[in-house]
Amino acid sequence: NKISPNPKHTYKIVSSNNILLDAADKIVDEKNMDIIVMGTRGITNDKKITFGSHTLQVLKYVQCPVLAIPNHYKYKQPKHILFPTNYLIPYKRRELKLLCEMASPFRASIDMLYISRSETLSMRQQDNRNFIKDELHKNIINFKTTNDKNISNAIYTYLKENSIDMLVMVNSRLTFLESILFKTTIDKMSLYLDIPFLALQNISRENL
């Protein structure tokens, strides 16, 4: 299909006979890409699979934020964004700025969901929380807490009960996303995404 013209964007078609993951990593590195946008379904289009295998590989391993768009998703402005976190890892300024710039034109509110049995934060967690607040200063930030023992269920419940338009998570060790990405069926995940999903990367990268 022909891409509609947009004065704010230019489009270039890139062809590669390489493996998708390798090709994506190469162009991200060469062009210092800010974000990858892709669909969530592969050739099988299996309704029991949340992400296609290609999407999973890119989400987990490419050193760049990835915005995954569900199959048959109808565009709507992202007015309400969910960002589950444990506040245990330092966040990248560049990637939080990306989220801020994506959300601010729509005056979106961002719900930071802390999933824990205790609302008390360590000094490290408090520092990371303050950093997020500073970097997302253009947006309305709501700090929420839930004590649900099942992370996937906690996220799924919050998505459905609060009319969330976009889910944001960080791909790193010791984060919620790491465990969720390795569970692909609805029965295992209890999380079926029908909204855009932005995966930020806590991976070393040059030119940050």
PLM features: residue spans?
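Active-site phosphate/pyrophosphate- and oxyanion-stabilizing loops and adjacent acidic/basic residues
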Residues: 56, 100, 130, 156, ...
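Charged helix-capping and loop-helix junction motifs
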Residues: 51-54, 126-129, 181-186
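Structural beta-alpha unit
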Residues: 2-36, 137-187, 191-195, 202-208
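Residues at the starts of beta-strands that form the adenosine-phosphate
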Residues: 10, 79-80, 107-111
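Redox- and metal-dependent alpha/beta enzyme cores, enriched for Fe-S-associated oxidoreductases
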Residues: 93-137
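Glycine/threonine-rich flexible loop motifs
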Residues: 45-50, 177-181
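Intrinsically disordered or low-complexity boundary/linker segments at protein termini
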Residues: 38-40, 60-95, 191-208
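Short, structured coil segments at secondary-structure junctions
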Residues: 54, 62, 106, 136-139, ...
